[in-house]
Swiss-Prot record:
Organism the protein comes from: Candida albicans (strain SC5314 / ATCC MYA-2876)
Keyword flag S-adenosyl-L-methionine: yes
Catalytic activity from the UniProt record: 2-[(3S)-amino-3-carboxypropyl]-L-histidyl-[translation elongation factor 2] + 4 S-adenosyl-L-methionine = diphthine methyl ester-[translation elongation factor 2] + 4 S-adenosyl-L-homocysteine + 3 H(+)
Protein name per its UniProtKB record: Diphthine methyl ester synthase 2
Domain of life: Eukaryota
Length: 299
């Protein structure tokens, strides 16, 4: 049996009771180590808490070496541990498909992830639209596929959760070209970088999916002892020191409920100023009034 087990957001003890019991009985235990990190735990503390040796599974192993993970999983129990919830990344869906093609049974044990814990910032989960990812730009590569999705969310008044890039065990182009297994230091996108990249793409596209004054909420180290929220405009957050990783960003939609707004006030520097920007943004994205089609006489 292959078990996909969510670990939650921060502590080694965030695993569910059923998840922990399952880990303890598995022959092999893998920890997916490239889409996220546990902020208050490491491999050593996990092994001590679970009482099991853990094999780190990097991107290369999961995406190209899945046969190694699935080896003998039809005869013995194998655990695949994922920070957050197992289905927070499409990579894990691919692993399940591969297992089923090999006739291996699969069971999933869910847990909290940023996708539901984001509600801790005070915004209502059913007011969120499509979630988007924001990757680190380079001098020659500045993908903007997220832009259209933000525009769609904003037009119908929904908030947008932006998941910020994580670079773990990545190679430089030069090292890849030379076939050298030398990896870059880990990098985690912070709030200021995310806001700056968003503003850069808006300056290029100029379709006004958002503006420098669009209200946002910065989320840092969600679920950890140092969890922090900061509400402000995109321009303000482009200069915000968000501290240690991990980070996410929420761009507010037009339909901000008064209870959401009241909750956000505790995270702002200037309540009246923030309220004014929210009101301006709501007016900016106010849809045009519906005009019914004219009757056309049929002859």
């Amino acid at each position: 049996m292959l078990y996909l087990i969510g670990l939650g957001l921060s502590y080694e003890s965030d695993i569910t009771v059923r998840g922990l019991e399952t880990v303890k009985k598995c022959k092999r235990v893998y920890l997916e180590a490239y889409t996220s990190i546990l902020m208050a735990a490491n491999q050593e503390s996990l092994e001590k808490f679970y009482g099991r040796e853990i094999i780190l599974a990097d991107r290369e192993l999961v995406e190209t070496g899945s046969d190694d993970i699935l080896k003998d999983a039809d005869k013995e129990d194998v655990a695949f541990l994922v920070v957050g919830d197992p289905f927070g990344a499409t990579t894990h869906t691919d692993l399940v498909i591969r297992a089923r093609e090999l006739g291996i049974k699969v069971e999933t044990i869910h847990n909290a992830s940023v996708m539901n814990a984001v509600g801790a910032c005070g915004l209502q989960l059913y007011q969120f639209g499509q979630t988007v990812s924001l990757v680190f730009f380079t001098d020659s590569w500045k993908p903007d596929s997220f832009y259209g999705k933000i525009m769609e969310n904003r037009k119908i008044g929904l908030h947008t959760l932006l998941l910020l890039d994580i670079k773990v065990k990545e190679q430089s182009i030069e090292n890849m070209a030379r076939g050298r297994l030398i990896y870059e230091p880990p990098r985690y996108m912070d709030i200021a970088t995310a806001a700056q990249q968003l503003l850069e793409i808006e300056s290029i596209r100029q379709e006004q999916a958002y503006t420098p004054n669009t209200p946002c909420v910065a989320i840092s180290r969600l679920g950890s002892p140092t969890q922090t929220f900061k509400a402000g405009t995109l321009q303000e957050l482009s200069e915000y020191d968000s501290g240690e990783p991990l980070h996410s960003l929420v761009m507010l939609g037009r339909q901000v409920h008064e209870l959401e707004l009241e909750y956000l006030y505790q995270f702002v520097d200037d309540k009246e100023k923030f309220k004014k920007f929210v009101e301006q943004d709501q007016e900016f994205f106010k849809p045009a009034p519906y005009v019914p089609p004219e009757d056309v006489d049929s002859e």
